Every structure is written in structure tokens, then in C-alpha cells.
Amino acid sequence: MKIDEFMTTRIESIDADRSVYDAIEKMVDRRIRSLLVVFSGKDKDHGVITARDIVFKVLSKKSDPKSIKIASIASKPIVSIDRAKTIHDAAALMEEAVIARVFVCEEGKIVGVLSLLDVMAASLILRARGNYVP
């Protein structure tokens, strides 16, 4: 089963120079757990900030999220996988990198994101179709 059958194509992003507080607001407002972090200038790679990053790196340390820039806690570079790969390929990559989501790319451009929940949904569908391979 191909990744693009389960990936989310609406990717929410935020600038790296914004505050962690801004990320919290956006994530809570949109009911999402991660944001693609966009870096400007000479360092144009992407990063990711997750709810886990915010809780463990900022809130648990009683730091002020308004005074911390996203760039300082974002994970970088992102882990990505080609759109043509399978759900099993994505699951193996997530396990190897110990991450909960991978960004899906096509010809070097980010076209989606696939989460652990998406992988579990694919597993249920494969099992229901009788195509499940453990």
C-alpha cells in the first residue's frame, strides 16, 4: 500500500523565528501535534516542532514559551520519504529514526506528512482486505 493513500497533504508550517508560544497557539487552534518549521536566509532547510518537543524542552522546564524561538528547539533536518514508497517502508523508517511522523516528498518537494496513526490505519485496512503481512 502506497504512502500517498494515507498521508495528510495539508501541512501546517511556522517560521523558525517565531516564539514557541506562537507554535502552541497554532497547534491548539488547529488541533494538530506538529508543525513544519521554515528557516529563512542561507539556512533554508526545514525542521519540525512537535507537541512533545514543546512539553519536554520548554514547559517541563518552566521556561517562558514567549521568550524561546522555535529555531532553538526544532528538530532538524526533517526525516523524509519518497511518495512512491510503501507504508511498510515508512514504518521501518519511523522505527529506525525513533520518530512519530515522516514528511513525504516528491521530486524534492514536501507533499505530505505521514504519522504513526496513519500507519496504524493502513494496517487495519490491509487486515480487513486480507492483505496484511506482519
Report the location of each language-model feature.
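Short glycine-rich, polar/acidic loop-and-turn segments at beta strand-coil junctions
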Residues: 39-41, 53
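The conserved cystathionine-beta-synthase
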Residues: 14-32, 38-39, 80-98, 104-105, ...
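Local beta-strand N-terminus motif with an aromatic residue
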Residues: 32, 45-46
